[in-house]
A protein has these predicted regions:
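An alpha-beta-alpha
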Residues: 43, 61, 152-202, 298, ...
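Bacterial signal peptide processing site
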Residues: 26-28
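Bacterial N-terminal signal peptides that target proteins for export
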Residues: 1-13
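Hydrophobic alpha-helical segments within soluble ligand-binding/sensing domains
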Residues: 36, 134-176, 276-297
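Hinge/cleft segment of the Venus flytrap/periplasmic-binding protein
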Residues: 291-354
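C-terminal motif of bacterial Sec signal peptides marking the signal peptidase cleavage site
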Residues: 20-24
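Extracytoplasmic "Venus flytrap"
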Residues: 40-63, 68, 79-89, 184-188, ...
């Protein structure tokens, strides 16, 4: 009898121990469980090319996601890669994101965003694009207000007329304007057409030179000098941006001011960059991604975010080399800008203080 009681007591103790063990296992669940464990979101970011503008966007996306994660008590597990303009590499990067079952993709620049859209059509993975100049023209969205599908993002739409105004504010007597761009860049198409219309209406001669490689861009810059243009306009063109450090001296030494569609051009040696704040563009891209993942926002109804185009960035070193007085130039530009910044030539924004 005594042995029977002891055996029953031991059995009860073992049973209770098993119950406590199972409870402990249940309370220590995975990342997506309740309790103290943070929710984990997997985000895949693909950059189109290594240049100052796009790198600045990526850096700010990553920093803002980290800040949001700390504030909201969640974790963003970010996978980042750069395809460096290689379509095959781009395809592989995006395919890897799909295979990894990421919760959201971010495509930096138009070509990446377009390929992400195509490859995710049969999935439920939302895509947030960044630095797409013409989202409607690229057929990424139905409209800026109502994207219509699982794709939305931020646009660096460029007001080409505003840059034309700056060109003629600087030189009212300019008779010949050069357009330097890559015909293969979708991001350049709308701005180039707008510039052509402006210049044609004004009766100004247009000189076009294009390039799709660094060597071709250099030859195009040299051709601008040979043609004696009064100024050069370059839109938000990643091919020219990548070659800017190699061509800026050619134009500056010839006394030709280059007006371009991003502050990164001025950083890399153009006389003036005009357009959006790319650091802020990155922050807002991250905010949209977080809104979709954390708050359940629907990309189909989450409006594309556009920005004030009114910031002009003047490279003061090039300004001096061209023989301009900065104060005179800044005063001439004031009616056409909401803000004027200055910068000196460097490879990246981390190398210089504005």
């Amino acid at each position: 009898m005594k042995n029977s009681i002891i055996k029953k007591a031991l059995a009860l103790v073992c049973a209770l121990a098993m119950v406590f063990t199972l409870c402990a296992c249940s309370s220590n669940g995975g990342d997506n469980g309740s309790g103290d464990s943070a929710k984990v979101y997997k985000v895949g970011i693909c950059n189109y090319v290594d240049d100052a503008s796009l790198n600045q966007i990526v850096e700010n996306i990553q920093a803002q996601l980290k800040a949001i994660g700390e504030e909201k008590g969640v974790t963003f597990k970010v996978s980042y890669d750069n395809c460096n303009e290689d379509a095959t590499v781009m395809e592989q990067i995006i395919s890897n994101f799909i295979a990894d079952d990421v919760d959201l993709m971010i495509g930096v620049a138009t070509p990446v965003a377009m390929r992400m859209q195509a490859l995710t059509e049969d999935t439920d993975i939302p895509v947030v694009f960044s630095a797409v100049s013409d989202p409607v023209g690229a057929e990424l969205v139905e409209s800026l207000d109502k994207p219509g599908a699982n794709v939305t993002g931020t646009s660096d739409y460029l007001d080409a007329d505003a840059i034309m105004n700056l060109i003629f504010a600087n030189d009212p007597d300019a008779k010949k304007i050069g357009l330097l761009y890559d015909v293969g860049q979708d991001s350049s198409a709308a701005s180039i057409e707008a510039a052509k219309k402006y210049l044609t209406d004004k009766g100004v001669e247009i000189v076009e030179h294009t390039g799709s490689t660094a060597d071709e861009v250099m030859l195009a810059a040299q051709a601008m000098v040979a043609d004696g243009v009064d100024a050069v306009f370059t839109p938000t063109d990643n091919t020219i941006m990548k070659a800017e450090l190699a061509i800026y001296e050619t134009l500056a030494k010839a006394g030709i001011p280059q007006f371009a569609g991003a502050d990164s051009f001025a950083l890399n040696g153009a006389f003036l960059g005009y357009g959006v704040d790319y650091a802020n563009l990155g922050v807002e891209t991250a905010n949209m991604a977080a809104d979709i993942l954390i708050n359940g926002a629907d990309p189909a109804t989450l409006a594309v975010k556009t920005f004030d185009n009114g910031t002009a960035t003047i490279n003061t070193e090039i300004c001096t080399e061209l023989g301009y007085d900065y104060d005179t130039v800044a005063k001439a530009f004031e009616p056409y800008c909401t803000k004027i910044n200055t910068i000196t030539t460097a490879e990246s924004f981390s190398d210089v203080q504005q």
